[in-house]
Amino acid sequence: MTSQAALKLVAKEEGDKQRALEAALAQIDRAFGKGSVMKLGEKGKVEIESVSTGSLGLDIALGIGGLPKGRIVEVYGPESSGKTTLALHVVAEVQKAGGTAAFVDAEHALDPSYAYKLGVNLDNLLVSQPDNGEQALEITDTLVRSGAVDIVVVDSVAALTPKAEIEGEMGDSLPGLQARLMSQALRKLTASINKANTIVIFINQIRHKIGVMYGSPETTTGGNALKFYASVRLDIRRTGSVKARDEIVGNNVRVKVVKNKVAPPFREVEFDIMYGEGISKLGEVIDLGVKAGIIDKAGSWFSYGSQRIGQGRDNVREFLKNNPDVAADIEKAVRKSSQKIEEELLVGGPEEGEED
């Protein structure tokens, strides 16, 4: 066979393949609707939409300016570390942008007055206090499938008690029941979350594994399914107290991006959570301004441009509170320097024994 004839045969085979592919795509479109299968390049550059976390540093650490829409997010940590506070800040940001938010309060512990102080619009917040885990996840699924809700917060996975456990006796042993419930629910939820472009935040608690000799003994409740399905996992820890003279007025908090499917993970950020106020934005503006070289720090004195803005962090915070224009200028400059700050926020990879 001549080389020309061989080329014609290859071209014919390629043409047959193309026609077969077109026929298959047409059949899929008829069966499942237009756009069920498409070439990735047809959509152009796929931009991931995000919602601010209410923390300037955490938005930078996440790499896309906040939490990704249409994804599952897990926020976990010890008790009183700021998990619900962080989730309520995200709810407030969604509402500010005109979105609809829902809060599935499985713990029956939501404080409306605290949520209001963080900027949550209580009149427009959908709240559910379900009786059992199945009911909580069914409500979450229905809200997501409606396509009308922008964020759903489930507080918390540990409180999603299966119906069989509630109806059983106090000492009954029901191994793996909650893990199976979460696994089944996430299989159902994940596709509809993506289609509806809804953020679903699962707040989770920490437990300790017995008999672990090496690596971290810590694990989260509800089995391994959530670890796999979550696009972003945030580990939040209280590292100290914020004091005004002798009075404790807040907590120092460290958040580590343990998993991130939309940007590089393992970034770590610290900020203050003030009692009755939430995340201290001005405190972050000062700290990140110093990191980016926008605010100069010499000893205990802080300067912005040629102007001295205060001695000591508390005095600088007070100055920025009284001069919101200066604070806004510094924040704008910090956001422009986000790439430089991102590199400084990078820490090591996962700790030994830490699961993805």
From Swiss-Prot:
Entry's Gene Ontology cellular component terms: cytosol
UniProt keywords, alphabetically: ATP-binding, Cytoplasm, DNA damage, DNA recombination, DNA repair, DNA-binding, Nucleotide-binding, SOS response
Lineage: superkingdom: Bacteria
ATP-binding in keyword set: yes
Leader sequence residues: none
Residues given in the record as ATP binding sites: G77, P78, E79, S80, S81, G82, K83, T84
UniProt subcellular location: Cytoplasm
Xref: InterPro entries: AAA+_ATPase, DNA_recomb/repair_RecA, DNA_recomb/repair_RecA_CS, P-loop_NTPase, RecA-like_C, RecA-like_N, RecA_ATP-bd, RecA_C_sf
Gene Ontology annotations of biological process type: DNA recombination; DNA repair; SOS response
Any one GO MF annotation of this record: ATP binding
ATP-binding keyword on record: yes
The family this protein is said to belong to: Belongs to the RecA family.
NCBIfam families given in the database record: tigrfam_recA
Cited function: Can catalyze the hydrolysis of ATP in the presence of single-stranded DNA, the ATP-dependent uptake of single-stranded DNA by duplex DNA, and the ATP-dependent hybridization of homologous single-stranded DNAs. It interacts with LexA causing its activation and leading to its autocatalytic cleavage.
PANTHER family xref list: MITOCHONDRIAL DNA REPAIR PROTEIN RECA HOMOLOG-RELATED (PTHR45900:SF1), RECA (PTHR45900)
Protein's name in the database: Protein RecA
UniProt source species: Caulobacter vibrioides (strain NA1000 / CB15N) (Caulobacter crescentus)
